């Protein structure tokens, strides 16, 4: 991979960081090796409403308020730590990497769908005052791009 002088200087001054933990990574890597090995991808024949395996789904017995959902990973390991740091430790930069993975999952699972809008889960006033930001709004803004 040939790198221009400008790219080299840019990387030296502003190194790329792991989308999940913030460690410095190679310019072409979205996550570090440690986080990559810890990712548990969502896969299989899953219900688009509840995310359970279809054989265990009971959505036909319940009223749904949305058509479908998707997620790139299970809430565990590096992803869980990254979300926790975003929500409770002020690591708002984690929203960039998480949103990138989430947007890719939407593209793969809803190709051709024209969305009217992207929304976020409202945060209580007390939580907003404590954190100073709404983590789901940060994610929604990035995904909408």
Model-assigned labels for residue ranges:
Residues 1-145:
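Glycine-rich phosphate/pyrophosphate-handling loop used in enzymes and phosphotransfer proteins
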């Amino acid at each position: 991979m040939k790198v221009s002088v400008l790219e080299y200087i840019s990387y030296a001054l502003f190194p790329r960081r792991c989308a999940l933990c913030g460690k410095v990574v190679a310019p072409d890597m979205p996550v570090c090796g440690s986080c990559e090995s810890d990712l548990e991808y969502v896969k299989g024949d899953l219900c688009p409403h509840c995310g359970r395996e279809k054989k265990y789904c009971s959505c036909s017995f319940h009223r749904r308020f949305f058509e479908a959902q998707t997620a790139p990973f299970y809430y565990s390991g590096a992803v869980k730590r990254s979300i926790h740091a975003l929500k409770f430790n002020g690591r708002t930069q984690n929203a960039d990497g998480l949103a990138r993975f989430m947007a890719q999952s939407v593209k793969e699972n809803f190709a051709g769908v024209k969305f009217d809008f992207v929304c976020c889960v409202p945060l209580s006033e007390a939580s907003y005052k404590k954190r100073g930001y709404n983590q789901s709004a940060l994610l929604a803004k990035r995904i909408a791009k």
